[in-house]
């Protein structure tokens, strides 16, 4: 089984016999392996600091789709989140009220040295590019309007995908 420790600031990780010891402010956790889910600006391990960068990412959400529109994309029966590697990567999911949230793609912006620029938060051109990529994936939804848009800094691997087993002989990912 797996145990998840949310909102647990980690002070240190170190090998401990055949496993790992995670030192936290209020407790120590022993485990076989560690999966670290961290923010873009965290970097406890040098191996992870070199693999994770902050990128400015953009998302849009459609207006609620009709049953006919859902049938046209054959996505109305399940609500699985999806991703693809077109234009670097996209990720998208269906919401409870039948909207598609769509993010990523060529609209991702990185500044060398982990710097950021608040001036790109509401870049109209990046949102337009994201909507163009949406309709290239879902041409049958041409004409659907976007009701929401937002952006923010997220953590991404330098390869734009999960990087497993990067420290302590594969015991930390």
Task: Please tell me what each predicted stretch does.
Residues 1-12:
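A conserved beta-strand/loop element that lines the FAD pocket in flavoprotein oxidoreductases
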Residues 10-20, 28-67, 72-171:
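Active-site substrate-recognition segment that forms the wall
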């Amino acid at each position: 089984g797996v145990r998840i420790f949310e909102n647990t600031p980690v002070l240190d990780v170190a090998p401990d016999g055949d496993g790992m010891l995670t030192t936290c402010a209020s407790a120590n956790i022993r485990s076989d392996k560690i999966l670290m889910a961290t923010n873009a600006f965290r970097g406890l391990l040098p191996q992870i600091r070199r693999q994770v960068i902050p990128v400015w990412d953009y998302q849009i959400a459609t207006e609620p789709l009709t049953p006919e529109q859902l049938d046209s994309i054959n996505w109305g029966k399940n609500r699985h989140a999806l991703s693809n590697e077109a234009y670097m990567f996209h990720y998208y999911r269906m919401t409870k009220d039948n909207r598609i949230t769509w993010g990523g793609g060529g609209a991702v912006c990185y500044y060398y040295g982990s710097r950021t620029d608040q001036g790109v938060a509401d870049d109209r051109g990046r949102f337009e590019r994201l909507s163009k990529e949406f309709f290239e994936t879902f041409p049958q939804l041409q004409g659907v309007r976007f009701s929401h848009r937002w952006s923010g800094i997220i953590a991404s691997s330098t390869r734009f995908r999960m990087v497993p087993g990067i420290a302590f002989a594969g015991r930390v990912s």
